[in-house]
Amino acid sequence: SKAELIIAMAQLQHSEGLIICNGYKDAEFIDLGLYARQMGIPCFFVVETLSEVLIIIERSRALNIEPLIGVRIKTTVAVDGYWSQDSGDRSIFGLSTANLMELVDRLREAGLLHCLRLLHCHLGSQIPNIRNVRNGVLEACRFYSGLVQEGAPMCYLDLGGGLAVDYEGARTNSTHSMNYGLDEYCANIIESIRETLDP
């Protein structure tokens, strides 16, 4: 919300933190984020629909302030667990591969591809199987690498969701459990990123 963005701007005025703007973004919200950028606050707009990028481009031109842009991608990895029906290609959030390429084309045409610096994906919710987490991170890294090859100077990989709670205490990959601990979760994410992005 605009109120939350104003609070974040006040807190980060003399900090090295980032503001990541997900969710609904209208022209006023984008203007506010662009003013934050003008103040030296790194405020990213995470594009979740193609219509958002048109508003970002238009407001950026009107205010003559370059945006910081991120993109939320929809991975194809279907995950196990309670939310499996809404995972992978069936997810309603994020851009598909075709939409991602259209975003890149629109930013390139607008001369703003250099503003695309962050890739975000939400791996899922309450993922019981560590293999699903690893596969999701590997796919996100391939998207990240593809954006670099397209000419975007990527800097940030923002991985959300996934970490489960072992409600059963069974340490299995059943719907209400998890077959990994926090250390293994973190290690798998780091190893997957190194495996894909570290030359």
Identify the residue ranges that each predicted region occupies.
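Active-site-proximal beta-alpha core segment in soluble small-molecule metabolic enzymes
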Residues: K2-Y156, V165, G181
